[in-house]
Each structure stands twice: as structure tokens, then as C-alpha cells.
Amino acid sequence: MTTVLVTGASGFVGSHLLPELLGADHRVVALVRSAEAGAKVTRRLPAELLAKVELRTGDVDRPATLAPALDGVDAVIHLVAIARDSSGGRQLLAVNLDGTRNLIAAMQASGVRRLVHLGALGVADREELHYGKSKARAERAVAESGLDWTILKPSLLFGPGDGFFNIVADLVRLSPGIVPVPGDGKSRFQPLHVADLALCLRLSLERPETVGHAYELGGPRTWTYRQITAEVCRAMGRRRAIVPVPVPLIKLVAGAAEAVHLPFPVATDQLRQLALDNVGPIDGVHAAFGFVPRRMEGELRYLRRRRAQQGPTEVA
């Protein structure tokens, strides 16, 4: 039995990863920032699995909390990340990059060598974007750490509790018969179900041959943004016209909302990302891990229900 520290255990990916690890007879140490986050972890798990979970309070932003969190641990799966901020990228760098560096330093000091890191597809080519810069630099820090690392780089994730698809669903709910898409709606994505990512994370942990490798992961089909929006409408049973809107216009509205601290579905940095392709090898999951991930068609029924608010460890 491997004892695995999971950072971001209370977030979207963590909520699917913990049952995957526990079902394979691993013991989990869930790193949580607060008692509230810990309660969220335990509420989601069936009673028969709780005995194999230990909650430890800590935060990658607070290096002094990481050494106690690593005590008795064999490996780490690092999920913590944020996808937006309103500080010109400073918070993204603080959490995504500095938090990863803090974890690496703590692992080096404690002697825990095995690290599976959740990266993001396409960020190496997008360092002009705040999110891309923070994630690309974090991935480089992992690769240069001297630890026994594996990096998984997924495209958009879907599944109960997700960020992106629920945002599109909210736009559909709020729209008066039309749904805006940024630009021409032709940017391409390769949506991957979060449960399939969780399986890839577990298999990475268990297979020594994955050490020293980074894997680009996506679903079995490429979708344009416009096609994704249409599929969300179908899943929700809503008829909507899909209308392209120039990215500069949406950025203007988003920037104005950010300036006065009004809620807006996406930040300006995220809008720039949505106008760019986010695809990898179409058989990336099968080539690396030996299974075919599920298709998105028919899997979005959860969008009929409004999601609960996610915490700051959410990977959007």
C-alpha cells in the first residue's frame, strides 16, 4: 500500500482522484487548507473508504506546513492550481509557480522523491498569457527538480463539478435565446473526462516507466468551441442561437467588470486562451496508459443541475 499526499484534495480533480486511489488500495493523505475544506473531502467519500484517508492541514503557500504534511508519505500528487486572478497574474504565479516550488523544496528536504504533477496542455507555447506563464514555469521547475517526476497535461476537463462547461451552461441559462462565443468559435479543444484523468494519475503513480515523462492528454475527439457550446445546449435541452462575438469586445466588457470587481464568467486572460487551439495527440491517453477515454457525447447531463461553488484549488 502506497501512502500518497494529494494537494488540492478538496477541488474538482481531487474529488474524483481520491476514490480512484482508495479503490486501488492506496492510503491517502489529503492536504487541505481549512476544516471546511476537510469536511468537503469527507462528505464526498463513502464511509467504507474514510478509514484510509487522513486529513492534514497545510498550504503550498505556507512552506512551514509542508514538512509535517509529508511525514510518512511515499509519493505526492500535486493538483493545486488556479486559473484566473484579478492581480495582473501575480496570484497565478504565487499559487501555480511558487506553490509548486515550495512543495518541491519540502520534498527534497524530507526525502520524498515521487511526484506526479498536474500540468496543462499547450502552456509551453503561451507564456505571454498569465496562466500559461505560471503553469509552464511550474512544469519546468518539476522537470528540473531532480525528483522522480511525471507530468500530465490535459486539455479541457469535463465531469460533475467542472469549471469550464458549467460556465458555458450558466451562459446558456442566462441568455435570451442566444449564446455568445468568443471570436469565430473555431478554436479547437480535446475535452477529457475527469474520471479518465484520475485513472491516468493513478496509473502514473503506479508505473515506474512514467518517471521522467510528460504526457499530453485529451479525449478521443476534437471539438471547436462552437461545437462544444452546441453540445452543452443539447445536454441541457435548451434551444439557443450561437453568435460569434469579437474577442476585443468581450475583453472590453470583462476588463470593465474586473476593474469594478463585478463578477464575470471568464477573465480577460482566459478569453485570450479560449481563442487558441488546445489539442494534443488524439490517441495520447491510449498510447500512454492503454485505455480509450470516454467520449463527451451523452456525458454532459450533469449540466442540467447548477453546480456548487468550487474552492480556490479548483482547476478550471
Could you say what each language-model-derived stretch is?
Residues 31-36, 59-60:
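N-terminal Rossmann-fold cofactor-binding loop
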Residues 16, 20, 106, 141, ...:
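Rossmann-fold NAD(P)-dependent oxidoreductase module
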Residues 170-192, 196, 200-211, 216:
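A conserved pocket-lining segment of Rossmann-fold NAD(P)-dependent short-chain dehydrogenase/reductase
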Residues 127-129, 150-169, 188, 223:
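Flexible, glycine-rich beta-alpha linker
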Residues 47-102, 106, 121-125:
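NAD(P)H-binding glycine-rich loop region in Rossmannoid oxidoreductase-like domains
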